[in-house]
Regions:
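Helical segment within the ABC ATPase nucleotide-binding domain
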Residues: 191-205
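Catalytic Walker B motif of ABC-type/P-loop ATPase nucleotide-binding domains
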Residues: 176-180
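ABC ATPase "signature
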Residues: 237-238
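Conserved catalytic motifs of ABC-family nucleotide-binding domains
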Residues: 172
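Conserved ABC ATPase "signature" region
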Residues: 23, 118, 122, 129-147
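Helix-to-loop junction immediately C-terminal to a conserved catalytic motif
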Residues: 69
Length: 270
């Protein structure tokens, strides 16, 4: 009997209203959305699998992750996290996932790192003892143990990024969604974090990982499969080795370049 996928996406579409200015902006709510971000894509990620989303800027990578993270709604279609529909049951879905992007972290910048993470732990209904134990473990893993009592506003960009990653991991989510996971990290810290993702979270703890990345060496190191998005459509979904074999390429970079040049998208199957 096949297990239920950790992430399921069915005929997912997302349109955004076109940008307008002046008097046209007054009619914005009445305008039919015309800018396509996702064009009815379907795919599934199995439990304990690591999948990388790869594509050019504007391909729909961040939009897909934001829908799965319950931050924006799809126009049509369905998406589920651990069998929880992200549109119908967003609170249940959020409990199953961790999400991090290198953008705005949404921290209380005048509070300490410890206070920020403690607040997040309380939002996830952790007891004080459980929160302290998980905070200590996660802080050590992410290399922020010495920064716990510093105000967030005093941290460097790279350190703030680490704190954001720690927050995403704090409640030990079943599904982890990451947008450019090693952005702003120095090479050594990035290598350590990649090992944490693949060896600790995915292999040892069975965490399901879906991440967007432009760094193909990172994709090769972490991903079991690669989902290639172009103009909101899935053009390929296979293992790095499978992509190379299908395109007769010797490297993943060559394979993705050849696939990106194809004009006819191929819809993946669940």
């Amino acid at each position: 009997m096949m297990s239920t996928p950790a992430i399921s996406v069915e005929s997912l579409e997302k349109y955004f209203p076109p940008a307008r200015s002046g008097w046209r902006a007054l009619l914005q709510p009445l305008a039919r959305p015309t800018e396509l971000a996702l064009a009815g894509i379907s795919f599934a990620v199995e439990r304990g699998e690591a999948v990388a989303i790869v594509g050019s800027n504007g391909a729909g990578k961040s939009t897909l992750l934001r829908i799965l993270a319950t931050l924006i709604l799809p126009t049509r279609g369905r998406a589920s996290i651990a069998e929880c529909d992200v549109e119908r049951h967003p609170s249940r879905a959020r409990y199953q996932l961790g999400y991090h992007t290198g953008g705005d972290e949404g921290f209380y910048t005048r509070l300490s790192v410890r206070e920020n993470l403690g607040f997040f732990a309380a939002m996830n209904n952790m007891s004080r003892a459980e929160a302290q134990a998980r905070l200590a473990l996660t802080a050590e893993r992410m290399g922020i143990a010495r920064e716990l009592d510093r105000q967030v506003r005093t941290l460097s960009t790279g350190m703030t990024h680490r704190v954001g990653l720690a927050r995403a991991l704090l409640h030990q989510p079943a599904v982890l969604l990451l947008d450019e996971p090693t952005r702003s990290l120095d090479p050594l810290a990035a290598a350590d974090f990649r090992r944490l993702l693949k060896d600790d979270l995915v292999r040892q703890h069975g965490t399901t990982l879906l991440f967007a990345s432009h760094t193909l060496s990172e994709v090769e190191q972490i991903a079991d499969r690669v989902l290639l998005l172009e103009a909101g459509r899935i053009t390929a979904f296979d293992s790095p080795r499978g992509l190379c074999a299908a395109t007769r390429a010797t490297t993943l970079e060559d394979a993705i370049t050849r696939l990106a040049r194809r004009t006819a998208p191929v819809q993946s199957q669940l």
